[in-house]
Amino acid sequence: MSVAVPSEGASPRRRSGPAAPEGVTAVVVTHRRPGLAGDVVRSLLADEGFAPEQVVVVVNGAGGLDDPELESAVRMVRLPTNSGPAGGFRAALAAAFEEPTVGWAYLCEDDVGLFDLPTPRVARVLAEVERLDDASGTGAVVAYGRRFVGRGHTVNVVPDPAGPPLVPVDVAAWGATLVSRRVIDRGVLPAAEWFFGYEDFDFFCRVRAAGLTVLVDSASARAAEVVQTDQGRDAALAQARPIDADEPWRAYYVARNFFPLARAHGSANWLGWHLAYSARRVQRARGRAARVATLHGLVDGARGRMGVHPRYVRTTGERPRPPD
């Protein structure tokens, strides 16, 4: 792992609003998406008000940022190989909390800027956490979250506008998530062997098992409601990066990693539901590659295989951008 220290001469886009709170480090995890990751970093600086020294970029093997000057302004952590979101966000939390005065890490996926979440939100969300009766029990605040509704199935949570600003959820995608130092103090980190697929669900389940709450930011969840549907997600992503259906390799990990999720946090009934749902996925798959990946994932999941499978990895991170 190599680390680049920010240079003093770089001048990234200046913030347009108030400064981000002290004691927060923002971390962007990226793989093969320099343009999208650059957009997220620029938004962190200009919209959320982070100073460059408060921003870390974890490069998962291939990639980086689209602007050398921007790279020189923030802290770059380069992992030697692609460790998936599991290993990437594990490294992100380790980097964020190296400084003992940091109490919160703001974890961002490299494509979360495509979801048009309300900004600035970090200062607002942390202020809302402090107003909670049990603020010290908060482990994470996610931008959009889900609840289990039986046999491992989850539903998107869209809080009522008249309700509280923060609402409990069970699990979430990484998205744009605030994680408290309390989480790593209790020994909870993403499990690198999951590589990709349900590694985020496993992490948040373990946060809750450690006695901490996982909350969703109600305002962000309402703004992201449309992109939590398959059609809305595809529409948000299609112009900038391959949609999920264009990446059949994903199906392998979705099929495989539900097995350890069920074993660790569910029951045998979850596996029955998963097998039935996987059969439906095979029937509805757009091509042979996705069908083969699903069946291969089911076999490896039953056998307990974990880690990266070299046959199932990303090859294209983002679409070419038109010239300025």
Sequence positions of predicted segments:
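Short, well-formed alpha-helical segments that are part of the catalytic scaffolds
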Residues: R33-A46
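Acidic donor-binding segment of Leloir-type glycosyltransferases
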Residues: L45-R78
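Glycine-rich, basic loop-to-helix element that forms the pyrophosphate-binding segment
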Residues: L79-E98
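Short beta-strand-to-loop acidic/aromatic patch adjacent to the donor-nucleotide binding site
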Residues: V102-G113
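Short beta-strand-to-loop element that shapes/binds the nucleotide-sugar donor at the catalytic cleft/hinge
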Residues: V141-G152
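A recurrent flexible, glycine/aromatic-enriched loop bordering the glycosyltransferase active site
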Residues: P161-V179
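A short, conserved alpha-helix in the catalytic core of glycosyltransferases
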Residues: V183, G187-V188, E193-S220
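Non-catalytic, C-terminal membrane-associated alpha-helical segments of glycosyltransferases
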Residues: R263-D324
